[in-house]
């Protein structure tokens, strides 16, 4: 029975992933809680604009644990290796990489006794993508549109001024090329949730995914300012650099803390974008993906070995990320 459940996706991968786009008499309910309007969904998932000022980025330090740093590395990497994917897909795929890495680490250090679901064959039949050393099972989001309708595109074409036959042919060739390169949006499949659902009495028939909303929320709250950085601007007792931010004498509101974390995320995303951009000019997408994990390992926060370091936090100097950039020739 379990083997049959593992292979269930072979029988219904296309049908399951296209439910939201199927025509119905009544207004269809959103799949996985997402709005039916793809453009609105993508707008709601937008991350802070990356800070690309090298001086600002190079002087910044963030305080975090390893998992959200993996997530940030992966979601920015996919911006370069899979640029045709919407942000919802990049967040879902990056969360898949992060969760799979955390699961393997937990098993390795002995705090989780169950083997990773992918090693037991769960998700067999779903397409595979290799991202930062991980083989991620994905589900195609058939029919998902997020960049505007063909009617809008056609209206733009009609509104353009008359052009020569040669220019028309050139425009048609460019349009055909864009159509060929357009990717089908993807979800990362949550194999651990799939195993849990299929081995429980009340298992769901849906193929579970990593929700983009959860990945975004994780990123938005994960990057604190080290204590030593806060001390420079606030009247607080001196603490050792690298510890959690101390409580200042003047109360810091939740809104202030959230804005600070968002700013730190902007700085981190900027550092990663500058790193990937420097190498994307000389490496193909596969080679860029292969190097990403090694770059992460070189800058990840130092924590205690084994179970003692699980969830541990430390400082990440963004200048260390910038130092990994390719030197101009």
Where are the regions a protein language model picked out?
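Structure-specific DNA junction-binding interface
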Residues: 4-329
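Basic, Lys/Arg-rich alpha-helical nucleic-acid-recognition elements, primarily the DNA-binding modules
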Residues: 1
